[in-house]
Amino acid sequence: MGDISDSYSGGTPTAGKTEYYGGDIPFIRSAEVNSDSTELFLTEEGLKNSSAKMVNKGDIIYALYGATSGEVGLARLNGAINQAILDIKPHANYDAQFIMQWLRKSKENIIATYLQGGQGNLSGTIVTSLLIDCPTYVEQKKIGDFFADLDTIITLHQRNISLYTKNSITPSQR
């Protein structure tokens, strides 16, 4: 992975410094790698005075720590990341969607290989050492787009099922 991308993780501003929080910069944490919103926001001062790093919408973001280890998504907003997230920027001729889908598919194997009994943390070194066999860029794009479309269809069906379940009348209501 390190041969086909650049990567970095961020950091967390000092928690006791209220002037670092409540600004306009979304602060993406590991439980939010597949979310289009965040609970916390940083100020410019908080970003500047910490090792938090900015990511761009469309970057691959990969959770390294705890219960969310191995969760992966494409950033849905520009924001800052903490040390529990690795930002992965593919080099030219490598498709972010394809790489993200490969990481998603490989999650169980990565965790089984690198985390003892599912405990512990992944690291940027582990992720960049992963070997990924990439087809041509055109094929990567087709594969990545196919799985993105499939994810969209699944999400839409899940929403429909939720709406149907929520709005259905139970036999006791008849």
Roles of regions detected by a PLM:
Residues E108-N109:
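Extracytoplasmic/periplasmic mature domains of Sec-exported, cell-envelope-associated bacterial proteins
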Residues M1-G11, D36:
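Non-catalytic DNA-recognition/assembly elements of restriction-modification systems
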